[in-house]
């Protein structure tokens, strides 16, 4: 269900935010570990691929149609293209024909609440293989990305809970004041007495 997937992504409030070192660090590590020129952490919404982190390229986003990672989110595990020139799906891709001239790609889906919302990927202008051990390492790095996203979600939920709790406390306080006013009016107490009890109730 792509609508549920996109909704999960939107609820993270991560799209169109500033670059962050905690994500950049993971992307840099991926590029270094697998000796690839490029690496990225990207998210796929309805129409685009948006980059939270990108190593050695200056892009904010691409269309979903041209995004390698849009294919990655259709797979439960690491998606690998050893040589794009040998792939009917990718040999005509604009990022293969033109800069950065992608020949090799490997991406692992980023999963939040059961939905594959994006990918951590490495890619290079030279074709190459990708071993099962390397798949496992890329998967481990991707889990770090998910941990950061879950921490972000927890922070946001905590802030929302705090706001709701404050609103509830204010509402309860208002209810107490109303009860005091009603009680004093029913008992025909003087206005100064009513005001005094209101102040004490706040």
Residue ranges and their predicted role:
Residues 69, 110-124:
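Sensory-domain boundary capping and coupling elements
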């Amino acid at each position: 269900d792509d609508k549920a997937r996109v909704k999960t992504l939107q609820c993270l409030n991560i799209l169109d935010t500033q670059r962050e070192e905690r994500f950049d660090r993971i992307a840099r590590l991926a590029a270094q570990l697998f000796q690839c020129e490029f690496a990225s952490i990207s998210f796929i919404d309805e129409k685009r691929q948006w980059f939270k982190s990108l190593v050695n390229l200056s892009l904010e986003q691409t269309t979903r149609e041209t995004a390698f990672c849009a294919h990655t989110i259709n797979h439960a595990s690491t998606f690998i293209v050893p040589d794009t020139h040998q792939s009917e799906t990718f040999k005509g891709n604009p990022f293969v024909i033109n800069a950065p001239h992608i020949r090799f790609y490997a991406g692992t889906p980023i999963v939040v609440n059961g939905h594959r919302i994006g990918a951590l990927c490495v890619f290079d202008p030279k074709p190459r293989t990708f071993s099962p051990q390397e798949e496992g390492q890329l998967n481990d790095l991707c889990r770090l990305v998910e941990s950061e996203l879950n921490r972000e979600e927890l922070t946001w939920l905590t802030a929302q809970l705090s706001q709701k709790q404050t609103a509830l406390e204010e509402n309860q306080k208002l209810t107490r004041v109303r009860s005091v006013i009603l009680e004093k009016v029913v008992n025909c107490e003087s206005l100064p007495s009513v005001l005094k009890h209101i102040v004490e109730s706040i």
